[in-house]
Structure formats: C-alpha cells, structure tokens
Amino acid sequence: MITTELARMLTRYKAWANEIIFSTVAALPEGEATRPRPTLFKNMVHTLNHPYVIDRVFQAHLEGRDHGFTARNTPTHPPLDELWRAVQVMDRWYVDLSDRLTDRELAETIRFQYIGGGDGAMTRGEIILHLVNHATYHRGFVADMLNQASVNPRAADLTVFLRDVHRAAAG
C-alpha cells in the first residue's frame, strides 16, 4: 500500500528529476534535442512528451473525466520550453494532489479504460507509483540519448533525491 508520506515524497522526486533532465536538454546546442535518433519516440523532446501525455491521461482518470487521447503520445510535440512549462504545471498538480489525499483515498480504486482498449483498475496510490516509475523509465531513454550526444546528465536517481533534497527538507 502506498502511504501519504510515500506519495508525497514520490511526486516531489518526480518533479525534481524532471527539472534535472529538462534543464540538461535545454542546455543542448540548437537542434540537438529534436535530432532524429533510433529510439521509440525518435528524439529527446518527443520522448519527454510521452510521460506528460500519460500524466494527463491519468489526471483525467483521477478526476473521473474523459482525457480525449486516442494514443499514448501525440503525433508531434510542442517546443521544449512549452513542454517544460506544461510539465511543471502537471508536476505541481500531482504534488498538490498527494498533499491532500488521505491514506484511505490513496487506497481507493479508480476504474478506467486503457487507450489501447480494455478495462483498467488501479488505486490512486498505484497510479502515482506508476507515473513516477514511468517517467523515470523514459528519462532513462533521454539520458541515453544525451550520452550519445556526449553529454553526461546530472544524476537524477531516487537515492540522490533522498540524500540531497528530501531528507534535507524534512530535517
């Protein structure tokens, strides 16, 4: 079971890690972030767009409304700076959500339809865990693309967040 304390830490971790990867990608030379690469979403920005789309999908599930998406990513992506602003708003929404949910609410099951078809059911806590894990997975894709561009991104591991940010804020 995901507790309120864990949900709050995880949503803050996700926002912190997103800031690291977005600032690293933003510092690249012009055109490098959208240069075609042999990877699932073809470039860094489109890869970063995918977790944002999924965050929006699950936001709609949590709010009990239709999300309007027919695919797990959009055909094109916005410019990096526009995407980053949208991701920050979304990260804040999830941090605020985790701050107001109770343990009982985190354990409540949300029913939804998967974009690819089929019934889904996850607790609010499982949704938060999934979104944090999902974003980490795709930041890893971007970190690999950064390494291909001879850029070594700053560590955005949970252990680093716990050591440098979370425990410092708590203590």
What are these model-derived regions, one by one?
Residues 65-106:
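Helix-adjacent hinge/juxtasegments
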Residues 3:
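N-terminal beta-strand motif that seeds the catalytic metal site of vicinal oxygen chelate
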Residues 7, 18, 80, 87-91, ...:
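A structural signal for well-ordered alpha-helical scaffolds and beta->alpha junctions
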Residues 103-115:
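Carboxylate-rich helix-loop segments that flank metal/cofactor sites and access channels
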Residues 8-73, 114-171:
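Short, contiguous alpha-helical
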